[in-house]
Amino acid sequence: MVLMILPVIGSVSVSEGLVAMITMCLAYLILRLFRTEIPEGLLQLPGPKPLPIIGNVLEVGRNPYLSLTAMSKRYGDVFQIQIGMRPVVVLSGSETVRQALIKQGDXFAGRPDLYSFRFINDGKSLAFSTDQAGVWRARRKLAYSALRSFATLEGTTPEYSCALEEHVSKEAEYLVKQLHTVMEADGSFDPFRHIVVSVANVICGMCFGRRYDHNHQELLNLVNLSDEFGQVVASGNPADFIPILQYLPSTTMKKFLNINDRFNTFVQKIVSEHYTTFDKDNIRDITDSLIDHCEDRKLDENSNVQMSDEKIVGIVNDLFGAGFDTISTALSWSVMYLVAYPEIQERLYQEMNETVGPDRTPCLSDKPKLPFLEAFILETFRHSSFLPFTIPHCTSKDTSLNGYFIPKDTCVFINQWQINHDAELWKDPSSFNPDRFLNADGTEVNKLEGEKMMVFGMGKRRCIGEVIARSEVFLFLAILVQNLRFHSMPGEPLDMTPEYGLTMKHKRCQLRAAMRARNEE
């Protein structure tokens, strides 16, 4: 299941610790003897001095996005830390990151050969693969073509412009009814619990062409798998940074492999069913689209890579995981901000009421006519920065950036949180202010401001599902804003402190929601 590996290290056993200590001592001495020579005219990377055994792990701490942002103020936009045996270059600053990922994209498009990455889709994941050509390039092109084809699929009735709009609209309307029912029964609801099930249902519809009841065990199993995956990976895998540990027994790694195997088995079953019922003239979902593109060989003309059933399973796995946790986290944060800023929530409703009205369901074509809602989404992405880092990059060759030499195969962290909270880029970055993304008269989104915000990565490894993800968040939120007014629980302060993990989530809490009157002004 594809999610994001973050720069953290979990707990280790006594035996792991002893082996690691010996290994690190030897490695430290070897590295001291065989330092990479810096080419003339380039500078050595700055950064905090690492300890011989653990590197800079203590300084990185439990909230790397904050500690590495603080380090960037001291060492600059390009600096180096050491985690275990692995040197890591940390990039901050919008211009520096754009220079690396776009202007020097080929040099920074790699993925580090982390031990964990090898077991995600057998090392051939779209998101985590260390390969930059051949299989990875063909698989990425295939996935992009399938997504593009799916985006043009018609809905089952004329009221929907496309299949995506139909899936999201129906699920969002059902979510409104569910929250109303839960409120009548319990008087409060857990926003993340209900949103995550709804988003899982949408991604099941998109990938597999099926929708579940919210209490269906198969759907809940998927949600639980994702939660288990997040808990296991968020703790970090020491073997990623201390390679000798991969040869020792690891309970965490066993859980990690088991979760991936269970999800792969589920996807394999559905892909097999799709092959049995596939009809080229009736493409139902993304899996059908992948099968269709494989059969038509719509790949790079220069690529001889053959796409097997197993590869389709892997791509579906990638797309499901990438579109699940990210979107559910974004929507959950959006609801929290609605509650935290009731005046903004009312302004969003007024825009919705004046533009769409109370009787028609919002649709994707309404997006340009709802600039404040779009600005609210952008500010939610920026302020929460729920994806504080991209998936780690890696240099594909010896290169330089801002005058500093960076050797080939160096692991690179991109600090998206720092970019989204950079005082040189944003006025009063700690304040939540959607208006920062609007033009002077508030009638449309300022595209230049919107492009400054970073959440989906950049360059050759940018998220291929970004357009669909943005559309899904917009439509879900539009329907929620039109139909519900969200409140905090009386006497319970809202805690917006993020909890660091695969994606940064808010603390679980209970909220209240009330149906809007259809003629409400």
Swiss-Prot record:
GO terms for cellular component: endoplasmic reticulum membrane. InterPro entries: Cyt_P450, Cyt_P450_CS, Cyt_P450_E_grp-I, Cyt_P450_E_grp-I_CYP1, Cyt_P450_sf. Pfam families: p450 (PF00067). Keywords: Endoplasmic reticulum, Heme, Iron, Membrane, Metal-binding, Microsome, Monooxygenase, Oxidoreductase. It is a peripheral membrane protein. Its main location: endoplasmic reticulum. Coiled coil: none annotated. It is found in: Endoplasmic reticulum membrane; Microsome membrane. It catalyses: an organic molecule + reduced [NADPH--hemoprotein reductase] + O2 = an alcohol + oxidized [NADPH--hemoprotein reductase] + H2O + H(+). Cytochromes P450 are a group of heme-thiolate monooxygenases. They oxidize a variety of structurally unrelated compounds, including steroids, fatty acids, and xenobiotics. Belongs to the cytochrome P450 family. This is Cytochrome P450 1A1. It comes from Stenotomus chrysops.
